[in-house]
């Protein structure tokens, strides 16, 4: 068995790769950037360049063929089209197992990853698992992310969620579940909502960060329109800004509180990381700018 990890420079794929190195699982990393893996296990790959598809599935002498693919869709407005094209190519090369990274609010047949989910379900003799995590904790700590920069620069977090609650999850836990799915003997054409243990409002996130950092962090509450404008000011495209703001309104209405999932522990045997634990480990990311 050899695993192909698309989205090789992404946060989740990097953690999956780390797990596979420790457990000696053969894998290749597919991305446009060679920094995603070593020269030996990196494959040049671009979702928008079908000529790179064969290269992504090519293995070195002595390696077993690619048998399962981690699908991490690209950050495109129409992300489903290129991913579906790659799935069809991979199936033509006898790949029969896929694990898709989707999102908690996106169901099969819905927009974006939902279209990919539906396509996987329609292919005969293909088995799959879809992971549907809620919002990433690392959105608060990754350099360049709007929330991270807002905490560092303005000591605030922005949202249009009002008092809606989110069970934020760490990419570390998503990767642990993904590694289990990618190495499972069989996949059951199923989807799994992944959540962290703490159901938090953004007010509570700000309060937790205040305690960890020793300086006041606030929650700047916005309307959906105000948040979209703020995101566009920060360089987000209009399509993505309005989509993100609309998702915040869904959170305000309780979209992330309706399902309680213990899937991380069920898959891995270990409880997911709590928000305070995450914040303590990422404290250096939020040093205030002078």
From Swiss-Prot:
It is an enzyme of class 1 (oxidoreductase). The keyword Oxidoreductase applies. Pfam families: NmrA (PF05368). InterPro entries: Ergot_Alk_Oxidoreductase (IPR051604), Ergot_alkaloid_biosynthesis (IPR019901), NAD(P)-bd_dom_sf (IPR036291), NmrA-like (IPR008030). GO terms for biological process: ergot alkaloid biosynthetic process. Its EC number is 1.5.1.46. Pathway: Alkaloid biosynthesis; ergot alkaloid biosynthesis. One of its GO terms (molecular function) is oxidoreductase activity, acting on the CH-NH group of donors, NAD or NADP as acceptor. It comes from the Eukaryota. It catalyses: agroclavine + NADP(+) = didehydroagroclavine + NADPH + H(+). Keywords: Alkaloid metabolism, NADP, Oxidoreductase. NCBIfam families: ergot_EASG. Monomer. Belongs to the fgaFS/easG family. Agroclavine dehydrogenase; part of the gene cluster that mediates the biosynthesis of fungal ergot alkaloid. DmaW catalyzes the first step of ergot alkaloid biosynthesis by condensing dimethylallyl diphosphate (DMAP) and tryptophan to form 4-dimethylallyl-L-tryptophan. The second step is catalyzed by the methyltransferase easF that methylates 4-dimethylallyl-L-tryptophan in the presence of S-adenosyl-L-methionine, resulting in the formation of 4-dimethylallyl-L-abrine. This is Agroclavine dehydrogenase. It comes from Claviceps purpurea. The gene is easG.
């Amino acid at each position: 068995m050899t695993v192909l990890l698309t989205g090789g420079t992404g946060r989740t794929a990097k953690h999956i790769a780390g797990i596979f190195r420790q457990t000696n699982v053969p894998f290749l990393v597919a991305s446009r950037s060679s920094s995603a893996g070593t020269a030996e296990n990196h494959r040049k790959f671009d979702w928008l360049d079908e000529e790179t598809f064969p290269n992504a599935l090519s293995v070195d002498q002595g390696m077993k063929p690619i048998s399962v693919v981690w699908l991490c869709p690209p950050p495109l407005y129409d992300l489903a089209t290129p991913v579906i094209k790659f799935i069809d190519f991979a199936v033509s090369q006898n790949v029969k197992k896929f694990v898709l990274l989707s999102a908690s609010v996106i169901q099969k047949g819905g927009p974006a990853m939902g279209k990919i989910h539906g396509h996987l379900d329609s292919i005969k003799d293909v088995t799959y698992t879809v992971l549907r995590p809620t919002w990433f904790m690392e959105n608060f700590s990754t350099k360049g992310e709007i929330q991270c920069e807002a905490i560092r620069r303005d000591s605030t977090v922005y949202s249009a969620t009002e008092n809606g609650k989110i069970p934020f999850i760490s990419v570390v836990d998503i990767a642990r579940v993904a590694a289990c799915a990618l190495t499972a003997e069989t996949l059951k054409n199923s989807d799994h909502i992944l959540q962290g243990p703490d159901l938090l409002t953004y007010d509570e996130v700000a309060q937790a960060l205040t305690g960890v950092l020793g300086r006041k962090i606030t929650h700047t509450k916005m309307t959906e329109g105000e948040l979209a404008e703020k995101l566009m000011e920060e360089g987000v495209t209009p399509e993505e800004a309005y989509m993100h703001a609309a998702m915040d309104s869904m959170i305000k209405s309780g979209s992330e509180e309706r399902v309680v999932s213990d899937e991380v522990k069920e898959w891995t045997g270990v409880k997911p990381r709590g928000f305070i634990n995450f914040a303590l480990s990422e404290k250096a990311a939020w040093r205030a700018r002078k």
